[in-house]
Every structure is written in C-alpha cells, then in structure tokens.
Amino acid sequence: MSRRLRRTKIVCTMGPSTDRDNNLEKIIAAGANVVRMNFSHGTPDDHIGRAERVRSIAKKLGKTVAILGDLQGPKIRVSTFKDGKIFLNVGDKFILDAELPKGEGTQESVGLDYKTLPQDVVPGDILLLDDGRVQLKVLSTDGAKVFTEVTVGGPLSNNKGINKLGGGLSADALTEKDKADIITAARIGVDFLAVSFPRSSADLNYARELAQQAGLNAKIVAKVERAETVANDEAMDDIILASDVIMVARGDLGVEIGDPELVGVQKKLIRRSRQLNRAVITATQMMESMISNPMPTRAEVMDVANAVLDGTDAVMLSAETAAGQYPSETVAAMASVCLGAEKMPSINVSRHRMDKEFETIEESVAMSAMYAANHMKGVAAIVTLSSTGRTPLLMSRISSGLPIFALSRNQETLNLCALYRGVTPIYHGEESRTEAGAKAAPQSLKEKGYLSTGDLVLVTQGGQGATQTNVCRTLIVE
C-alpha cells in the first residue's frame, strides 16, 4: 500500500455557509463523502442547483460524493407568540391550545402546529419543549386544550419543538410536504433518502413505495428519533430491517429517552445495524462548537472518536457546515479525529459471523474474502468488482483494518459505496465479470497510487452467465 486511507466516512449538510466563498468545493476537498440536503429549508430549485454544483465539483476534483436527501417529517411544534418569546417559571400554569391562531401566544397559552396533541397525551405525561429546555407536566385535557404545569422553566420562543418523554406522539412520518419533496429528490436523483420520525417499518415501506413511484431508487435511511423505535429489540430490528441505512439522530431521540440512555442505545444501534447488513450514520452536535470556533472541544473529539470505535460507517455534520463560520476546517478536524481513532488495533479485526450461516452465494464469497484477509499474512487490500454495491457493503460489515476498493463503471454504485465504512469507490471501465477485468483491477489501482508492485491483494467478482459462480482470486500486483 502506498497511501493511508480514512475508513470512516463524513456526511456534511449543505446550507448558506456552503453556498458562499467556494465552501462547497472546500468541504469536498477536505474530505466530505456524502452531502446532505435538508428539505426543511430551501426551495426545490435551491436543492436542484446545489446538487448540480456537488456533481460538478466532485467531477472536477476526481472524487465520489453521494447525495442524501433528508425529509422534514412532521412539525410537532408550538406556534408563535405575540411578542415572539416568553419566559416560563417553575409552577406556572400554561395551556397548549390547538385552536389558538398563529401569533396569539401569550404568557398563559400558545397555539400548536400539531393539532392532535390533545388526543396523544394523558394527565401525568411530561412534554419536552425546545429539546427539553422547558418541561411541562400534563394536568388535564379539554377538547383542543392541554392544561399543564411548568416543571422546568426557561425562555420559550416561536416554533419550538415538542417531544413527549418516552415517546408516543402519533404524527404520521410522511407529510404532504415530504411527498412533494420526494418528487424533488427524484428529479435530483439522490442516492439516499432519509425519513424523519418513522414509527415502524410501515412508514419506511411507504416512503420506499412513494420514491419508486416517482422513479427514484434511492436507499432508504431511517432516522431513529422516536423512543418507541428503540423500546425493545423487536422494535429496533423492525426499523433496521425495513431500511438500508440507520441514522442515530441523537437530538430528538435523546430528548425522548433521556441523554443517559442515549449512550447505550447508540452503541446497540450501531452494533445491530452492522449485524443485519445495514450501514449506519451517527449524527447531531458532533462538533457543534465549531459553528463559531476554529477548533473542536476535547469532548467533541472524544465523541467522534467513540462513534468510530463503536463501528459507525459515517459521522455527520449539520449546522457546523450548513451555517457555521468554519465549514471546511470542521470537516478537516473531523477527518483527522477519525484517522486517529482508526489507529486503535481493537477495531481492526472482527470475529462477527464466524458461527453464522450465509444466505447467498454472494455473501459467502464476500465473507470468505474477509476471512482470508484477516488470516492471510501480507494481504495489502481487498478489491471487489461490483455492479450493485452489495458485495462491498457485506464486506464492510467485517472489520479487517485493510482497505476495500469497490471498482465499478456504474456511478450510482460508486455513490452508494461512498457511505460504507472502509470502502473506497473507484471508477473502473473494464467489464467486471471477466477474468481479464479482475486482473486489470490491481493494475488500475497501482496506476492511481493506491497499490505498489508486489502487493498481495484479494479480488472478488460476480460470475458471467447462468452457469458461472462468484469467485475470489489472490493476485500479486505486477
């Protein structure tokens, strides 16, 4: 091997900061592997224009960059106040009124964007406003009104979010706006489509169905934000198996289950997603201080590093790159932390699946290659010629410490591989199912500077024709 590669991928959110000062090119050059379009903000034309710039810059820099479209989901929020803001003290009585018009909120009451809240709560429930900064105990309900008492006081301003401790709000995961945004996502051709606040596999299946009807074959990302989706193993597996990618959305999830529980849930989600052959993104406030500071805190460094040690495929930046003052510096700092964490030998070898049966020939070949990589002395890299990206995904579920090069002439496949941990997507124009194509792959990587003469590599590829089988070859770079 002639260069060291970062295995953990970085997802960056686009916004006003990436629209100025050539920052979009700077964050891609600094190491962004996936760019996130937050459909909560901006118009369809904004998103389409940004996608075009991403693809143009990626081509210019010779990089593979995937696009993730993130649907807004239900707006479970208070409405607006006459004066824009109030201050609630502990013990105050406060009414949430679904019939109160916008702009009519006072010290005593405020309207609701989420009109069915009174039907979702019972006396004793705790409502968490503005990520838990203000907390209300439900005393009673009467028609459209929820009568509460303030248990944690503080300022409350327009359009702040509402969560229920322990979850249980019944809002549909997909709104009419989301359905329109799926059409925009299809026009863009996003690689990944994130669904906010899914309650169960049914929400994810519905999103996939709507995407396919729009002509979009994107991988579905489940943003795990509701307490009920992590309440037990069955609920967690239901969400994971219905998705292609899991996002550990620690903001709303942390509010609903409590931050002390979040630590274990993050680790369990990452571990279980990998076991079930799903990719996983860890998100929310990973380098929050770099919105306004040029360096991360030590705590943020440790947070990113711990997600890497947990086995996450990717770590995500939100406001840090969308609205921050130092977007490219944040990406560079995150990349550096990932590389540092990846030096830990304990994360480089996995015994996962040693006692499991394989369900397909493709999986058996992929796992055989990874077993050989972990037990054969001197292997420098794993090379897989892939038309769909499935084999690189399966390989990346096993830790080896070795780079996995996914070679394909299908750009959509390369974009998917941009998210998978340890996988470096490389364009390869040769036919992927022939022996000549397999032998040409290491030479191509040598020419690009990834391999050196004498390197030992494992090469896998699919078969050609109905009578051919998938194969794994051991080759020496000439």
UniProtKB/Swiss-Prot annotation:
Keywords: Allosteric enzyme, ATP-binding, Glycolysis, Kinase, Magnesium, Metal-binding, Nucleotide-binding, Potassium, Pyruvate, Transferase
GO cellular component: cytoplasm; cytosol
Residues where K(+) binds: 38, 40, 70
Cofactor: Mg(2+); K(+)
Pfam families per the UniProt record, alphabetical: PK (PF00224), PK_C (PF02887)
Enzyme class name: transferase
UniProt subunit comment: Homotetramer.
Name recorded for this polypeptide: Pyruvate kinase
UniProt source species: Haemophilus influenzae (strain ATCC 51907 / DSM 11121 / KW20 / Rd)
